[in-house]
Amino acid sequence: MTLSILYAASSPSWEEYEAPLTAALGATGLRYRLGPDLPAAEVDYIVYAPDSDVQDFSRFPRLKAVLNLWAGVERVVGNPTLRVPLARMVDDEGLTQGMVEYVTGHVLRHHLGMDAHIVNPDHAWHHEAPPLSRDRPVTVLGLGALGTACARALSALGFPVTGWSRTAKQIDGLRCLHGTDQLGTALDGAQILILLLPDTAATTDILDAAALARLAPGAFVINPGRGPLIDDGALLAALDSGRVAHATLDVFRTEPLPRDHAYWAHPGVTITPHIASETRAGSAARVVADNIRRSEAGEPLRHLVDRAAGY
């Protein structure tokens, strides 16, 4: 049987993915046809991004699974017409490695105090050595694929890393805490906080005034996860008071970030335009193709979304 695989995404574009998907699917040995315009009645799989025009999945009677090209699924997971398995993108070659590089780079930037040397209009000679990594406690909120990879990379550099997640995890070399009762403990005394949680009702404003108050004075906050994780007003107040020394933010409630947003003008905020990590077409295509192969072989799909949890 020839499978029909619909490409339904505005970003990334079909032009970017046509060749990598064709190559990856060809390597599986499956018979297939692939494209952005296929009859709904014949579609077996959808390679998807939530910005697609496809929002009514009930139009696809043969649909077996939806393979998301984005790591985040908050814009599709609650779709009542989606009644087949939904797999999120976990791309160790591209997405994960990119996040590790972004997080590690900004952790080292703040740990080493590089901003004082990069921006030094007074030409001051700041002869003050930074502490060693072993003396800089780091907390990572979120121990999914991205959070775990970042936590392991920082631990390998000598940072004492605490990881927190909704459910219990055991990861060699890390102090792992979980559940609402242990969130405060995970935050207590952290000098660098990294947010890599999904966007769910339970994580909205998880970094509020009470949470910020538990960090070490002069802490650094890095958010490459999701914009709604942060209570923006509380973070700005913490920056103004010095409770937080600096925040590096890659994601926001509204994107692009409005030009009049207070973050732009704040000297304690670094803004990057949602570039912490990108799905790479070549490696992502291999992830998608492997999941289709697994489905056709009767094997469980990888990276299935838990609808109840929202990620």
Feature locations, PLM:
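N-terminal glycine-/charge-rich "phosphate-binding" loop or analogous flexible N-terminal tail
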Residues: 1-44
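Short acidic low-complexity segments
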Residues: 31-42, 54-56, 173-189
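Phosphate/diphosphate ligand-binding glycine-rich loop within oxidoreductases
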Residues: 44-118
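C-terminal helix-to-coil terminal segments
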Residues: 88-99, 116-117, 170, 255-311
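A charged, well-structured terminal subsegment
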Residues: 105-129, 282-283, 287-288, 294
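Glycine-rich NAD(P)-binding loop of Rossmann-like domains
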Residues: 117-149
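Rossmann-like adenosine-cofactor binding region
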Residues: 168-262
